[in-house]
């Protein structure tokens, strides 16, 4: 008998529509998988078992609905999405015990599409990290090697999808937080164009950088989820009004044959590990074998992207997290004598060390006397980085680049050196600065580490159709990496 949890989202969705499987069958299989794997992975912060089974039972009683593309499909959510009646912590003691009274827009869209919400996944606190080790509650492990990190900050989502606990998970990407864990865990992850998916109901980190996207096991699955969650929402004034497309229906619209693909010189220079380089070069050769045209392009300001990103992200974080003060919701210190004590003690007790570091640095770059030297300068360089990327994309259909310079590192490694951790985002954060779409696709296993390697397909604004179609074509041209023996 086929293991339900090993199927793709697309295969399960089709079987559900044909009544070859019931929503209760699929949901029960995923909950059993969670029970078996969660003690090893620690991917989930909250399991919504009772409500998920009730939802599946209701769906079965109503019968399949072809107009609902995720009918009966179990999914998980990064715990940065507001969920009515379910705890939402952002991985922080500051929000421990907080239960919203409304759903985020993307969660509403999943409900409308017929999905079954299984639970909430672990993340770095307030999405600030690249390993999911910064969570206040637990440390998530990589399904390929339990001694390795899953990446971050959406590490729980990537681990959950790869381990077969669910068929898709929603994450957020501020500087690579969907793409990097997808690369480390060997699944597909998409950061859409800024404004393609509403951020309403998402706990904000960097408001000009954050974007919502799916993590799945295949590009076709990713396209199906994006179709479900994309669309205009008036409650997010950065949400773009142009209508969403049926991304799954257009996957054959752009084959690799005849495609002009750019290779950014700066992404393949010093610092790229040998095993990541080899896997990416093999993927480039696979594209060439499909008659794609490969051209070298240059992005001269790549070296400035890390500093630019962290100045802007930390400045926005210091502003966004000012609302967590112990007054309205979240952690409230008991050790208070006056209003100042309430603010200081609540925030000191509620926030972890990495969040405090970013708040302090953000406040510094926004302070009088330093605003022009840091924040204003970073905003200017951000424009240069965006212009360079758009100029490069003007020469080709998409760019191919590594997601991370290395494969997943050991748990506990480099945790005392924030700068080394920040460097892990060197190849992903430019897309957030520019607001461009990027798809992380597994292209091989490291020859030395045996860990997954991901490659980014970078596209022009709102050209997710082409990014996904090229990703689908490249996925078909590659042998695949299999699944971890968890």
Curated annotation (Swiss-Prot):
EC number from the UniProt entry: 6.3.5.7
NCBIfam families: gatA
GO molecular function annotation: ATP binding; glutaminyl-tRNA synthase (glutamine-hydrolyzing) activity
GO cellular component terms, semicolon-separated: glutamyl-tRNA(Gln) amidotransferase complex
Subunit structure: Heterotrimer of A, B and C subunits.
Record's catalysed reaction(s): L-glutamyl-tRNA(Gln) + L-glutamine + ATP + H2O = L-glutaminyl-tRNA(Gln) + L-glutamate + ADP + phosphate + H(+)
Species the sequence originates in: Desulfovibrio desulfuricans (strain ATCC 27774 / DSM 6949 / MB)
SUPFAM superfamilies, alphabetized: Amidase signature (AS) enzymes (SSF75304)
Active-site annotation: 78 (charge relay system), 153 (charge relay system), 177 (acyl-ester intermediate)
Annotated function: Allows the formation of correctly charged Gln-tRNA(Gln) through the transamidation of misacylated Glu-tRNA(Gln) in organisms which lack glutaminyl-tRNA synthetase. The reaction takes place in the presence of glutamine and ATP through an activated gamma-phospho-Glu-tRNA(Gln).
UniProt keyword annotations, A-Z: ATP-binding, Ligase, Nucleotide-binding, Protein biosynthesis
Family listed: Belongs to the amidase family. GatA subfamily.
GO term, biological process aspect, one: translation
Protein name, entry field: Glutamyl-tRNA(Gln) amidotransferase subunit A
Pfam family, one: Amidase
């Amino acid at each position: 008998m086929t293991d339900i949890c090993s199927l793709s989202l697309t295969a399960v969705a089709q079987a559900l529509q044909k009544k070859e499987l019931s929503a209760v069958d699929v949901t029960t299989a995923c909950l059993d998988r969670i029970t078996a794997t969660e003690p090893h992975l620690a991917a989930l912060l909250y399991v919504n078992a009772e409500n998920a089974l009730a939802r599946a039972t209701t769906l079965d009683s109503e019968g399949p609905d072809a107009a609902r593309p995720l009918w009966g499909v179990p999914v998980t959510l990064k715990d940065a999405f507001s969920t009515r009646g379910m705890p939402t912590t952002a991985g922080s003691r500051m929000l421990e015990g907080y239960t919203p009274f409304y759903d985020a827009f993307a969660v509403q869209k999943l409900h409308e599409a017929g999905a079954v919400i299984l639970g909430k996944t672990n993340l770095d606190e307030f999405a600030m990290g690249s390993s999911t080790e910064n969570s206040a509650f637990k440390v998530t492990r990589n399904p390929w090697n339990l001694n390795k990190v899953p990446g971050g900050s959406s590490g729980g989502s990537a681990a959950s999808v790869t381990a077969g606990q669910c068929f898709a998970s929603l994450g957020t990407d501020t500087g690579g937080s969907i793409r990097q864990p997808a690369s480390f865990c060997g699944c597909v992850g998409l950061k859409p164009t800024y404004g393609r998916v509403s951020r309403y109901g998402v706990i904000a980190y960097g408001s000009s950088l954050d974007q919502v996207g799916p993590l799945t096991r295949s590009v076709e699955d990713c396209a199906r989820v994006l179709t479900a969650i994309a669309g205009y929402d008036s409650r997010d004034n950065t949400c773009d009004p142009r209508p969403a497309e049926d991304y799954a229906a257009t996957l054959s619209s752009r084959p690799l044959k005849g495609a002009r693909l750019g290779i950014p010189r700066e992404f393949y220079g010093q610092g790229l590990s040998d095993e990541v380089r080899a896997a990416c070069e093999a993927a480039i050769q696979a594209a060439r074998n499909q008659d794609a045209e490969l051209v070298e392009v240059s992005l001269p300001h790549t070296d400035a992207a890390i500093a630019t990103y962290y100045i802007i992200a930390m400045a926005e974080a210091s502003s966004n997290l000012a609302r967590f003060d112990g007054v309205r919701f979240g952690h409230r210190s008991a050790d208070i004598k006056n209003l100042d004590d309430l603010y200081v003690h609540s925030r000191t007790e509620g926030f972890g060390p990495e969040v405090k570091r970013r708040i302090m640095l953000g406040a510094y770059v926004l302070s009088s006397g330093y605003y022009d030297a840091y924040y204003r300068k970073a905003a200017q360089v951000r424009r240069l980085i965006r212009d360079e990327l758009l100029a490069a994309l003007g020469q080709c259909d998409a760019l191919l680049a590594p997601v991370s310079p290395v494969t997943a590192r050991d748990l506990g490694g480099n945790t005392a050196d924030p700068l080394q951790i920040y460097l892990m985002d060197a190849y992903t954060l430019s897309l957030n600065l520019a607001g461009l779409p990027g798809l992380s696709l597994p292209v091989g296993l490291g020859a030395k580490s045996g860990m997954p390697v991901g490659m980014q397909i970078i596209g022009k604004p709102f050209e997710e159709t082409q990014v996904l179609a090229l990703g689908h074509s490249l996925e078909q041209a590659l042998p695949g990496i299999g699944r971890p023996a968890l």
